[in-house]
């Protein structure tokens, strides 16, 4: 039997998703909890491996098991062995044709950026921060150069294991709400550090360091050295993974973040 799980986690508490020998990753803790509940080792396959500090609101995994359990018991039972920084949100039996990674046709990330002269300790690990004003319109104009199917090598980390740098970026939204600017990135898939590298460039344009069309030159150059430094991970959230309707994957629950009303207006599942 194949079971899919919806996972939420506070990325600030972990060294990324992927299992490591030190055991301080989300995958390590999740698989430990599953093994405690099931009394047998279970290996999970994830929709997208997030980096250290990146949060998960709509992460999806699957695993295979011969065990017979009431479906919701996978939620309740696994959560009993998880720390407060990770939670299984739902469980659903799936056909063998479902694959958490390869069945997904799109991913949506949000970035919450606090724009204020003084940093807030209450937002540590939850939102990015910049102390200088930003030009929203300039960032929107810059983002427009990135929409479409392109070679995103300029925004790819040296550790990226993707077979191709060509991705289709469907949407970048920039929305201001008080002292926050919220960014939404939707694509068929993302390269390692791609969203954080895009953020670094958009913020550089917003600060007036470069004109909006600079980003078109960076994209065309296909050279990571042309782009701005990688932006901080603190405000980055994997919000949604899109699957074909036949799998009826439950929607991500965004209400667990304080700016969920702003994100709801942007609607990550359209």
From Swiss-Prot:
SUPFAM superfamilies: Pseudouridine synthase. GO terms for molecular function: RNA binding; tRNA pseudouridine(38-40) synthase activity. It is an enzyme of class 5 (isomerase). HAMAP family: TruA. The active site is at residue 51. This is tRNA pseudouridine synthase A. It catalyses: uridine(38/39/40) in tRNA = pseudouridine(38/39/40) in tRNA. It comes from Burkholderia cenocepacia (strain HI2424).
